[in-house]
């Protein structure tokens, strides 16, 4: 039999949450190798982090694993809450209410990250979701758990907050504000950030011909590119120089990977075209041979 598993300490749980917020879910090796969390999580493995994160996700919604199992069996289909103006009555905490809890004897006195930050009240959940996606600054988008953890870290949340976040994310992705790709949410290409000015349409001149940019076939690609650029700029706004350099390096790596794939696809297309030409030549030669045999056959 293996050694009994050690109980997770508050410091380890806080480090795990902070690691997921920084690197995203599923990046267990990256979290363990990060110098910010490696010292606290030195006695944990990838499987430990994965199992603990699953337990945290369950208890964050239902309060306990037993309640979660019972709720999944008994919960009737609830009514949709798509009203964006529904205010959540949450009392804002002051700095005095956010004092760090004393650590247990023999434990490390570092405490959990971001423990002394004051939490704000929530008035519009959609704005808070936009803030979370923007501040998490994940180029591929943020998953639902990361968004909820950001809200939980910065706001005082009720027990059923995760369900509200899930409902709002589903609504925002259905109306086109957000795009959901592989369980991750990001701003859609036609999303205009608050405060961004939209330029009036202009006429483009090419020689003596005037083109109307309001036609979708002529200006659709330019508008789509502009909105995508605005969305990316809004995502990386406020990045430090190091974070911007890392984001640029990731973008370059993705572009190089896309170029490599395109080159491979082009080579495969050329190979298929050459094979098709060879097959066509062989078919013509076979047809000529057949006609020659028929013509010279002694009947």
From Swiss-Prot:
SMART domains tied to this protein: H15, SANT
Pfam assignment, any one: Linker_histone
DNA-binding annotation, residue ranges on this chain: 28-57
Domain HTH myb-type: 1-61
Keywords (A to Z) from UniProt: Chromosome, Coiled coil, DNA-binding, Nucleus, Transcription, Transcription regulation
Subcellular location: Nucleus; Nucleus, Nucleolus; Chromosome
A single GO cellular-component term on record: nucleosome
Protein name: Telomere repeat-binding factor 2
Gene name of this polypeptide: TRB2
């Amino acid at each position: 039999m293996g050694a009994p598993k050690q109980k997770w300490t508050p410091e380890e749980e806080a480090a795990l949450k902070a690691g997921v917020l920084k690197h995203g879910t599923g990046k267990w090796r990256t979290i363990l190798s990060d110098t910010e969390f490696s010292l606290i999580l030195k006695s944990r493995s990838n499987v430990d982090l994965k199992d603990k994160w699953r337990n945290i996700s369950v208890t964050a919604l239902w309060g306990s694993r037993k309640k979660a199992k019972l709720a999944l069996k008994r919960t009737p289909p609830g009514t949709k809450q798509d009203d964006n103006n529904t205010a959540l009555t949450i009392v804002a905490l002051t700095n005095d209410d956010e004092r760090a809890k004393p650590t247990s004897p023999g434990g490390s006195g570092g405490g959990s990250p971001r423990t002394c930050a004051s939490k704000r009240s929530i008035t519009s959940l959609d704005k808070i979701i936009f803030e979370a996606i923007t501040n998490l600054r994940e180029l591929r988008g943020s998953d639902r758990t990361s968004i909820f953890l950001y809200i939980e870290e910065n706001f005082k949340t009720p027990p059923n907050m995760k369900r509200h976040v899930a409902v709002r994310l589903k609504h925002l992705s259905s109306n086109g504000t957000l795009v959901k790709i592989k369980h991750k949410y990001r701003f859609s290409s036609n999303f205009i950030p608050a405060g961004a000015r939209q330029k009036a349409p202009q006429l483009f001149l090419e020689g003596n011909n005037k083109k109307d940019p309001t036609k979708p076939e002529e200006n659709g690609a330019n508008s789509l590119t502009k909105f995508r650029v605005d969305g990316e700029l809004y995502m990386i706004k406020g990045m430090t120089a190091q974070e911007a350099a890392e984001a640029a390096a990731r973008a370059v790596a993705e572009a190089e990977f896309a170029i490599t794939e395109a080159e491979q696809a082009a080579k495969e297309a050329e190979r298929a075209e050459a094979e098709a030409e060879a097959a066509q030549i062989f078919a013509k030669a076979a047809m000529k041979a057949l006609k020659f045999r028929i013509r010279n056959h002694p009947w």
